[in-house]
Amino acid sequence: METGHPPSLQELCVVVLMRHHAQLEDIGHMPYALVRRVLLKMSAEQLLRLERASPALLLEDEEAWQQLLKKDFPTNVHEVWVARKKDVYEYYLESVRELGPQVLEDRALVRSLLRAAVCKDPVLFKYRVPSRQLYQRYVHEDARRQELSAARLRQSTLQLQQEKQKTRITQLEDPLYLERELNAGRQRAAPQRSSIYLKSFKELRQRQAHFRSGGYDPTQRRIVRVQTPSAQPAASLHPPPQSAPMAGSPQKPAPPEQPLAASPTPEAPGPLAQRRRPSARRQPPPASPAKRRSALFSSPALSTLLPQQDDTDSDTGGRPPKKPRVYIHTPR
């Protein structure tokens, strides 16, 4: 646009289209040179929408697709060459046939557009692959990579969920009842115990089997009290009083009491006697108490009582005399 001259109608229309390029749906049979600046501002989706409305635009928008290829796939290869010219022709004709087969009826127009779009490089002597074809190829490859990544992510997520299900803690309504029901049909494996535990457990079973009451209870033991010598009642030095004999009843003589013989204190054997072995000879049994002579008859108090016995015989008049009562007090 030159300064000093008012803008033309074509320039004003291009400015309006550039301001509202997102709302552009169809350009009809407008030449590419008029809408070039508008097409360079569009995205890939908008450009495809215009190609569906105007199929002949597909043979002229190589510059717009090349700019989109560099913008959306900056790391990919932007120029690919093929040796056969027929491959490029077949791609263009197939694309036009999909969008609008009525365009192919004008053979002269199609031939002129193809001749301008397909050019041989003077250095490589090859034909350049259309940028539109490269863009679509990269889009499909990117979608395939995303699909593979999503599949791997789903697989890893599924494995994590399965591992969580294995170690998941489930809450039971009645765990005691279910435990009895499960343990009724199978035997639980015995856990590995140490030798010290098994030994103590065996001793506990032996004690329980011995007492038959589950163990020793110190609170239920029987207490037996033994009387000490100081708590025993002291022996009386005097005999208990006896009731007087009735007249006319014969009195039985009391058996004489034998004195308690003091047991000799054993002396400690000497060192030579301790070394001697016990003799194998049989010792004579001790004499029975009945054969021992009582010391009552050798007591001096008996001689003093004999004259009195004679006097009593004369007084009784032939009746058997009463035997005297003799009390022997043995000092302790």
Swiss-Prot record:
Signal peptide: none
GO terms classed as biological process: transcription elongation by RNA polymerase II
PROSITE patterns per record: FBOX
GO cellular component: elongin complex
Region of interest called Disordered, as start-end residue ranges on this chain: 228-332
F-box domain residues: 24-68
Biased composition (Basic residues): 320-332
Parts of the chain that traverse the membrane: none
Ranges of Polar residues composition bias in the record: 296-309
Function: As part of the CRL3 E3 ubiquitin ligase complex; polyubiquitylates monoubiquitylated RNA polymerase II subunit RPO21 to trigger its proteolysis; plays a role in global genomic repair.
Assembly, per entry: Heterodimer with ELC1. Component of a CRL3 E3 ubiquitin ligase complex consisting of a cullin, the linker protein ELC1, the substrate receptor ELA1, and a RING protein. Interacts with the large RNA polymerase II subunit RPO21 in a manner dependent on DEF1.
Family statement drawn from the similarity comment of this UniProt entry: Belongs to the ELA1 family.
Protein's name according to its UniProt entry: Elongin-A
Species annotation: Eremothecium gossypii (strain ATCC 10895 / CBS 109.51 / FGSC 9923 / NRRL Y-1056)
Organism classification: Eukaryota, Fungi, Dikarya, Ascomycota, Saccharomycotina
